[in-house]
Design a protein with these regions (language model features):
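ATP/Mg2+ or Mg2+-diphosphate-binding catalytic cores
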Residues: 121-191
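Secondary-structure capping and boundary motifs in well-ordered enzyme cores
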Residues: 29, 34, 58-59, 105-113
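Activation segment
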Residues: 45, 49, 57-59
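Conserved catalytic-loop position in the HRD/HxD motif
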Residues: 36, 53
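Hydrophobic packing residues in well-ordered alpha-helices of helical domains and bundles
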Residues: 13-17, 113, 135-139
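Active-site activation/catalytic loop segments of kinase-like enzymes and analogous catalytic loops
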Residues: 1-3, 62-98, 110-130, 142-149
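ATP-dependent phospho-/nucleotidyl transfer catalytic cores
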Residues: 1-34, 43-45
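Protein kinase-like catalytic core scaffold
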Residues: 31, 50-52
Length: 191
């Protein structure tokens, strides 16, 4: 946030982040949490998925990996696919533990917001401070995810959501993403 020049009250943000922490900590941490679970870390070999880059894994809530995979900034999965994959996930999870769907979705939405903020922080640091272009290019996609998330209310975090809405409305984040797509024009060709 500070890099954008936005003004905000740090103590109010801290209060909302404490509330978020309390909500997230309601979830069990008794499962393996990949932490960087995204499509580029899943390889298909002989028709079977193989997982790479899991050295940062540890015990944690399974919601985080679901949020990481299904709300990847550049993946732009449609809601219909997310819903289908969430249903598949819950069916598989039911083999190991009972699932209260209402609670599942209630907790998941908080993890999706948390993961989106974590991604924006990482992209901002690696892009704007370490000057890595790939991360700068990824920021608008994560902002678009955040914009979509904020269409649904998070009454637990009123100040945070107001700041995030202001952030998503900044000029540098309101450009049409289609303008950012690469277009290659071949003007001559020889062989």
């Amino acid at each position: 946030l500070k890099a954008t020049g936005m003004e905000f009250q740090e103590d109010k943000l801290e209060d909302d982040f404490q509330k978020m922490s309390d909500v997230l900590l309601r979830s069990s941490s008794a499962t393996f949490m990949y932490r960087d679970f995204q499509s580029r870390n899943v390889m298909i070999k002989d028709g079977e998925p193989w997982f790479i880059d899991f050295q940062g894994g540890r015990k944690g809530p399974f919601y985080y990996d679901i949020a990481s995979f299904l709300w990847q900034a550049k993946a732009k999965y449609p809601d219909s696919l997310r819903k289908e994959l969430l249903q598949e996930y819950m069916e598989a999870l039911r083999k190991y533990q009972p699932i209260d769907e209402s609670y599942f979705y209630s907790q998941l939405r908080h993890f999706v917001l948390f993961r989106t903020l974590q991604v924006l922080g990482a992209y901002g640091f690696r892009g704007y401070f370490e000057k890595k272009p790939h991360f700068i290019q990824s920021v608008p996609y994560a902002i678009e995810n955040l914009r979509e998330l904020l269409k649904e209310e998070y009454p637990e975090y009123p100040y945070l959501c107001n700041v995030l809405r202001e952030l998503t409305g900044l000029k540098q984040f309101t450009d049409d993403l289609k303008k950012r797509q690469l277009t290659v024009k071949v003007m001559s060709f020889a062989y």
